Amino acid sequence: WSWNMFWLVLGGACLAQIATNASNDYFDHTSSADEINKVASPFNGGSRVIQVGLMTPGQVLITALVSILGTIGIGLYINQQISGYIFGNTPILWTGILGTFLALGYTGDPVRLGYKGFGEIAIALGFGPVMVMGAHYVLTFPMHNNDLALWNWAEALLASIPIALLVMLIVWI
């Protein structure tokens, strides 16, 4: 067990959440989706930080970019610690690539998964298997030492399903 890795994983996950929310607010603003929402509630319409003037669109975009770059930086550092190479071929590299795609592609151009009926699936994947399996891989590293045959990925995948469903249901409302 490594407390350093725990804090890095937690920090990366928090930055990923900030990046996802900020990019969602920014792209929903640029598409006018949040502006045309006349019945915004805690369950729809984003955080409304742009609409009520708490932040400018540029500030929200900078928040998203700094957060996603921080997430990527932490992920690459962890990957280097595990594999010996920044871009070493590990599950962390691939979950990081998928997570970045989901975070920015949720409402970001040109993908806009949330506008094409794939928003709930993207959220379930991002908060379920991507985060849970990534964290599990890093935090159980001393037990498998980067040997995929020893990594209990099925256990992590099963543990991610309830989380994926619960987080997905937040936006289902």
Task: Name what the model sees in each region.
Residues 1-23, 91-100, 149-172:
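Membrane-embedded alpha-helical segments that form the functional core of polytopic membrane enzymes
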Residues 8, 33-36, 40, 113, ...:
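Residue-level detector of solvent-exposed, low-hydrophobicity positions
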Residues 20-67:
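Aspartate-rich (DDxxD/NDxxD/DxxxD) Mg2+/diphosphate-binding motifs
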Residues 25-28, 34-35, 109, 147, ...:
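Acidic-enriched, low-complexity/disordered segments with a strong bias for Aspartate over Glutamate
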Residues 37-42, 82-89, 142-153:
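Short helix-coil transition/hinge motifs at the ends and kinks of transmembrane helices
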Residues 47-143:
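Intramembrane alpha-helical segments
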